[in-house]
Regions:
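Peripheral/terminal regions associated with large enzymatic or DNA-binding modules
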Residues: 2-267, 272-598, 602-621
Length: 621
């Protein structure tokens, strides 16, 4: 069988000889379009891409026989009155044979990739389309050229215009970040189902998204069955069930540990609901600030919030209404610009791997110190979170303050957000009769229509250095001031001096340095307390194991029996010769708290309930 060859290959070879020098002086983006529907979907994107400076945009169509020719695409562009400086090439495929189409597209795409070596090739994702299979095969064969293939489902194309606002440097990393979703749940199956429905309605642009549902030990049967039967078409589904109740703090922190620096996680509690455009905000922000030129400035950015907060919970007296527009008054920043805030969001956010890995080292070290030696008093100045007892955010806020880290927040009109919290009863939410429902306080409207770009100043995400920075209270401050505040606190709580370098190690060891002499003193005190506890344990058991003679008519002062216990406790050694309590068939009601050997006490802890009438202890002379 004779292979068909596209006339494009012969004519294009002559064109390349005259344009080769100009092609290599500029970055190149290519789009391959198979048919009119794809052309309609991708036209706004390639026209916007063509406006990039020093970027050549090439569009390849498969021909009139496949639904769209070069002339047809030109007419369509003219009808749209688009300013669109693109080079259009027509493969003019005439065959209807599926394998023939695949081979012709493979040949043409391979030739194009080898000759132009574009930075990016954008096309529609469709595994049933043999022309698209030809593109996939050509990209695979030319993998050594380093061309980034970006394939998106046709239904997502109309929501992809933000891609054209990214620099080519960022687009080349389209497939680099891997985003996983971690859901925390226990016994709210209806809430969980609502969250999953919102996830399924989102635009993921062809990315593979793994979903992990983390159930605590107390998960009810309905929740377990829902998780078992749940279908997740966007990637791998994982179900985890704890055998020991861990609580919300452990459930959140232990749900995710990054496998590399491109492994991102979306943390969601089950009473959160998402906008269909939450992943647009996620991927746009990650590519913009992590993989483009902005990355040299954004190393202290630890995540992206989906929730546009209208409450600041960190004021020392208590929660206060919060509107970033008010804090931006009198500055040069637009009222509705996204902003960088130190406060971590637990109501829908994506967290970055380096800082979360650092937090995984910092958090257990702090817990261990607080439950043992208590050598570090890390108190964030004028912040309510210092009083929190069961929140993982308390410790993350400490780390954030010490490092000067920030999170990106949306700031759309009327607090429109990519997530909302329904604030249903749970670990930190309690419904109180006669008071406003928590959802009325914390709930925000979801972005239901695609206004991701139109709601931003200038219609795009600002450069990192153009974003305002807010401290924990919400005041607009220079980023350098946040860093200096953290260094100042570190100087107070750690023996290791803070680094003056802007290069981050994401290792908390320098924060956790303590005086070794003080550590040894504290350890000796702990051992002494353990020894005292053992002595008291022995003394109390010695007394409690003797029955008391109640035949005598003399009454015993309850304090005297307690003094016997304390005499034994305070002695340097425990000896039966100190007291001699005879046995009796009658036992009085004596209740004394006996400490376990591993319990620590700072002073004798004896609880007594005594009914000692007609009891005579016999003490040796």
């Amino acid at each position: 069988m004779t292979r068909e060859r596209s006339p494009f290959l012969l004519s294009y070879q002559k064109q390349v000889q005259t344009t080769w020098l100009s092609l290599r002086l500029y970055e190149n983006t290519d789009l391959l379009i198979d048919g009119e529907k794809q052309g309609l979907g991708l036209q706004p994107i390639f026209c916007q891409l063509s406006s990039h400076k020093n970027v050549n945009t090439h569009v390849i169509v498969t021909g009139q026989g496949r639904g769209l020719s070069k002339a047809g695409l030109k007419n369509f562009i003219n009808e749209k009155n688009s300013s669109c400086e693109v080079s259009i090439y027509d493969l003019d495929i005439k065959t209807n044979n599926k394998i023939g189409v695949l081979e012709l597209v493979f040949q043409a795409t391979s030739h194009f990739l080898n000759q132009i070596q574009p930075d990016v090739l954008l096309y529609i994702k469709d595994s049933e389309n043999y022309a698209i299979r030809g593109i996939d095969s050509a990209l695979l064969a030319a993998s050594s050229l380093g061309v980034t293939g970006i394939s998106v489902p046709i239904e997502d194309a109309e929501h992809l215009i933000w891609l054209a606002h990214l620099p080519i440097e960022a687009l080349k990393h389209w497939n680099t970040p891997k985003v996983q979703v971690q859901v925390i749940t226990q016994d709210r199956p209806d809430s969980l189902a609502r969250l999953v429905r919102s996830l399924k309605s989102s635009h993921f642009f062809g990315d593979e998204i793994s979903l992990t549902i983390n159930m605590d030990r107390g998960a009810d049967p309905v929740t377990k069955e829902y998780c078992r039967t749940l279908e997740w078409p966007f990637g791998q589904k994982n179900i985890r069930h704890r055998i020991v109740q861990g609580g919300l703090m452990a459930a959140v922190v232990e749900s995710y540990y990054p496998k590399d620096d491109h492994d991102y996680t979306v943390l969601l509690e089950d009473d959160v609901e998402l906008s269909p455009y939450f992943y647009t905000w996620t991927k746009y922000g990650i590519l913009k600030y992590r993989y483009g030129p902005d990355r040299v400035h954004s190393s202290r950015m630890y995540g992206i919030s989906y929730y546009g907060s209208k409450i600041n919970e960190l004021y020392p007296p208590g929660r206060r209404p919060f509107d970033p527009a008010i804090f931006l008054e009198g500055t040069n920043f637009p009222f509705r610009t996204p902003y960088l805030w130190q406060v971590p969001c637990s109501w829908g956010a994506v967290y970055f791997p380096e800082v979360w890995r650092e937090f995984h080292d910092y958090f257990p070290a702090r817990l261990q110190d607080l439950s043992g030696l208590n050598l570090q008093n890390i108190t964030v100045p004028e912040t309510r979170s210092n009083r929190w007892k069961k929140s993982w955010k308390k410790f993350l806020i400490e780390l954030i303050y010490l490092r000067g880290y920030v999170m990106l927040y949306p700031n759309y009109e009327n607090f429109m957000s990519f997530s909302t919290n329904h604030a249903e009863a749970g670990t930190h939410i309690h419904l109180v009769e006669g008071k406003p429902r928590p959802n009325d306080i914390f709930g925000v409207p979801l972005m239901e229509e695609d206004v991701v770009l139109s709601g931003l100043p200038g219609g795009r995400l600002p450069n990192f250095t153009d974003l305002p920075t807010l401290d924990l209270i919400g005041n607009v401050v220079p980023r350098e001031e946040l860093i200096q505040r953290g260094r100042s606190l570190q100087s107070e709580v750690s023996l290791c001096p803070p680094s003056e370098s802007d290069e981050l190690t994401f290792d908390p060891k320098d924060i956790l340095c303590v005086n070794e002499e003080r550590r040894q003193i504290a350890m000796d005190e702990i051992e002494a307390r353990k020894e005292l506890s053992k002595k008291l344990h022995t003394a109390v058991k010695f007394i409690a194991n003797h029955t008391l003679d109640s035949n005598d008519e003399m009454e015993v002062d309850p304090e005297r029996l307690l003094n016997i216990v304390l005499e034994i406790y305070n002695s340097s050694s425990i000896s039966p010769s100190i007291v001699d309590l005879p046995t009796s068939t009658q036992t009085s009601a004596v209740e004394i708290k006996i400490l376990h050997d591993d319990e620590l006490v700072t002073e004798p802890q004896v609880t007594q309930t005594m009914e000692l009438s007609h009891v005579t202890p016999k003490v040796q002379k």
